[in-house]
């Protein structure tokens, strides 16, 4: 058993160099994403299991495309991968093609042509850290019953969780030819028979390079910070993708506390001047999608003032 009481003694600079070397070894990295504003595609557990299995099948079909993480939501997906651009595009096209077949077979034909977006190339180490954190908290943002460490439909919950990875490494179940043909209406996937499954789907442990992705972070504490506290980086990615994400009171409060100390030289929001509160309220409203009630709670600002600034729709 790993001793989690032992703290890393590797100097910060050396840790960063190791992470940078890992990023360079990956080659070209990409963020595959589909439109957030889209009708419901996956609505049942069987739908989500089919989605998980399809990602696994595409990983087998494209062994030169390395999946670092992914999450499947009811109406959109996010994946972080490495590989040559044309192969990554072909991977994404296969995913969309067979998902359309699955939906048609369940009497819910949906045109997914809007999903064929050009993947966004990841620019540097900091960018890929932010993308992985963004993906691994995406399901948590849309499902209040989950956390970034428990949402079931993706690779997120296996990060820095060796016990769960070990548990998912053992299975007596596997995908059958009958299931593949019935689910995806094709004989082309017969070669994927025998993939081990847990509770009806292929575990991400068997087809995602989670250990490689973990080495892009200095340690588990660094990863936890990126997922749970670094909301400014998350907001930047959302703006680039044209997505809207929402934050909890605690996340927004941590952001405001940081602004109080760095820009206004006070320790707590109640100590801000009224003008400073109004300026921060605009940032929270326009950049972080905070509603008036959230802003009122965090900044101790009168709700009537906020309703006049941002009239309820």
Label every model-predicted segment.
Residues 1-74, 84-313:
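Short Pro-Cys-Gly-centered "Cys-loop" motif that presents a nucleophilic cysteine in a tight turn
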Residues 76-78:
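Histidine-centered divalent metal-coordination motifs
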Residues 80-82:
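Short hydrophobic/aromatic beta-strand micro-patches
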